[in-house]
Amino acid sequence: MLKVAANGKLACISGCGNCYRPAGPMNADKLTGRASVVLVKTSDGSPGLRSSWLQNPKGNGVIAIGSRGLEDTISSARWVRLLNELESRRRQVSGRLDPVSKAELGQFLTPAPVAQFMTGMFAPQGRDISILDAGAGVGSLTAALIARFVGGPRTATRIRATLYEIDSALAQALERTMADCAELCATCGVMFEYEVLREDFLGAAAAALTLPLAGTSRTDFDCVILNPPYRKINGESETRRILTAAGIEANNLYSAFLAMAARLLKQGGELVAITPRSFCNGPYFKAFRRDFFSRMTLDRLHVYESRSHAFRDDEVLQENLIFHAVRTQKRPDAVVISSSLGPLDPSPRMWRVSYADVIHPRDPEMVVHVIADEAGRKAADVADQLSCSLHDLGLSVSTGRVVDFRARPYLRVNPDARSVPLIYPFNLENGYVVWPKPHPKKSTAIKSESATADLLIPSEVYIVVKRFSAKEERRRIVAALYDPDLIRCPAVGFENHLNYYHAEGRGLPRPLARGLTAFLNSTLADTYFRNLSGHTQVNAQDLRRLKYPSREQLLLIADRVGDDLADQIIVDRAVEEALELACSI
């Protein structure tokens, strides 16, 4: 067994008998013989990379490289050393970036374990491979991908890389990384060509696509690997003009990069990207989803369960996913979905889900259902049996009308004869709206007069749902029954951090409201919602997209749950029994 030390030397650290064991450490270039395994740790003590072709089962920050003869093993060791040096370089450069510029450009550089995981998704068929890396940073993704193609079981003979990086400081580091890759490719007998373009990717790519001759060196790529910038696009910007001219509708740079990159892939080409999950659902990304999936077919998804682990250095709390897609119209039977706590989780969970369960073929919005575990799969199966939309039930859902800072002159800390209840998220307790409920920073009532008439609704039976929750909360959907028998008043105001269900602006029949409240508080509904959305925000639009039990099923749920709308065991049993009974009739 050979160890690569911090000084780049190799030495046998066990009596394995499979490697040449000199009297002391030797340079990798001087070794002869055969080696079985090389173990590597980074010099600063941080977790090292894990090989994408031989995963380290212990997950202890050590690379395990299989024996393929000493020449291949030493070659792999050199790549490992380069990638670990590159990880240190990434941290140094990232720490020196100007925070203002970093925010403006949406820069979050890819950590080494994430890069290594992403490269493992590629399966190119040829040995002459062209790579596009847009927003390349210091080159972590491309370097890891080259190491995979050179050191993996299917060694490439020629690699061409096109890399875009607009930040001058990062571009300098990127040039250095590519020069290092070129040197190592030469020692491996692999022809390597690269081009670092210090220009705006979207503008340059749009220009390349309009060239009279197709098939230039800046189009028709075999592989695209992306950690695109994350920033909203100004409606009056040059970027917006470029995208419109290219036929791309995108509200964020990351979705714009994905849409443009898809156009640059050759048929059968592969794309792997790490992005926020937000594109998977919602009206803001509907046009993007239609555009992207008209060209690309999804076949792999990976979800990080923790918001903070993927980009720990940058304190990014966005929920991220990694996906692999192929430019083809042929849909696979299934999508492979996996999840892990973070990049260094040694035991990711993996399963296959029908493609039609991930992107429903008749869904005009092309929502991506991220079925993250077995519970998600079961919820998806049950949801397929739900028959009703809110419209079918004669119901609607709206966002609370009272924006408290705008209505401040009319708010009251203590209710009086001329005010009515103002309901906030903190008023939701054990399945019911509780009022009054003092709060140190919030009002409890709003003045009822002509100026506030449009902010209030009649005090009748409603279902109220929190719009915001922490990802780590037990339930994403938190619903409560507003019962006018418990809160005596002529009208009520719902604050803007709440959604409420109603029937054409008026209340619901009480039994129907109890059944629907219980359904929304069920584990089934919560898991179903998480399949649809990675947001901690529960928008009215999201609730409108859900499918619901029939009116008869909701009344069965109400009968079984009684008045207990918050006990999880009772609620889940009532929902399960009502849905099973209705299906058996």
Regions found by a protein language model. Name each.
Residues 4-6, 11, 23, 28-29, ...:
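Acidic, Ala/Val/Gly-enriched low-complexity intrinsically disordered segments
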Residues 12, 16-19:
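Cysteine-centered motifs
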Residues 16, 30-154, 162-181, 205, ...:
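Class I S-adenosyl-L-methionine
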Residues 103-104, 108-117, 136-143, 158, ...:
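Signature of N6-adenine DNA methyltransferases within the class I
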Residues 126-127, 152-158, 186-192, 216-219, ...:
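Short helix-terminating capping/connector loops at secondary-structure junctions
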Residues 129, 222, 462:
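Conserved acidic residues
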Residues 178-210:
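S-adenosyl-L-methionine
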Residues 375-584:
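Polybasic, glycine- and aromatic-enriched phosphate-binding surface used to engage nucleic acids
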